[in-house]
Amino acid sequence: MARKRANAAVLAQDHLGIKRFFALDEAAYRDGPLPGRIKELLGLAASLVLRCDDCVDYHLIQCVEAGWSEAEIVDALNVGLVVGGSIVIPHLRHAVKTLGELRQGGDSTST
């Protein structure tokens, strides 16, 4: 919910470039030659490599909602770890903690 409010505040700035980027981001995760649910796994791995915990949280929520199993999500996190190296380990810890909370039905991510 906090993410939606924050995005609304950003979009309220009424800047064409920002609006276009947000539209591009949304469109990138829609079904295309690759299904949207696979794109969420890609987004998760990329977010881990980029060390963006907010992004990791968002993509974890999307992956859980898309029906990916914990093993499949952890496999995607492994790809992010291999690509990103040891510097992403703190973010991997965060991701595993968040995934556990999501699986228990809680949402401490405030997204």
Where are the regions that the model predicts?
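Immediate flanking context of iron-sulfur cluster ligation sites
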Residues: 33-50, 71-76
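Iron-sulfur (Fe-S) cluster-binding segments and ferredoxin-like electron-carrier domains
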Residues: 58-72, 96
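Amphipathic alpha-helical segments within well-ordered protein domains
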Residues: 26, 43, 60-64, 77-78
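Acidic, glycine/proline-rich low-complexity segments that act as flexible tails and inter-domain linkers
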Residues: 1-40, 88-111
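Charge-rich, acidic-biased intrinsically disordered regions
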Residues: 67-78, 103-111
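Short cysteine clusters
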Residues: 52-55
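Glycine-rich phosphate/pyrophosphate-binding beta-alpha loops
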Residues: 82-87
